């Protein structure tokens, strides 16, 4: 299934929504924070990169021998494909996010999310499971991440500052 959001955010700011998990404990306190830790690893591959964040279940591996570790059930993998796409590997499904500018309006974008399951849905129970997962993802992005981004975009658009430096230390 594919769903489309049209946030009033520049497309590059929309992409920023997915670039770190440190905000989970504040912005997503009651939604996904109980599922994930707010730490992550970062690896680059040219203009592309990968983020790995641990699920809170990772503690179950504490007493496992290194040879028997199976990390995959205890992480989420976020793969950024330059310039505008993310593949998010969850425990049991994939999400493909594609983010584009919206016409000639710099303060708007289109975010398309396609949700992929390993097998076609075969029962009402499976349909309800996947719908619940999809609804959670869309709720978090549409009602938590993007409204914050829209507030930031409003600040940019207010012209309260003469200039903005981004990416310098």
Please place each PLM-identified region on the residue numbering.
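C-terminal catalytic domain of Rieske-type non-heme iron oxygenases
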Residues: 1-169
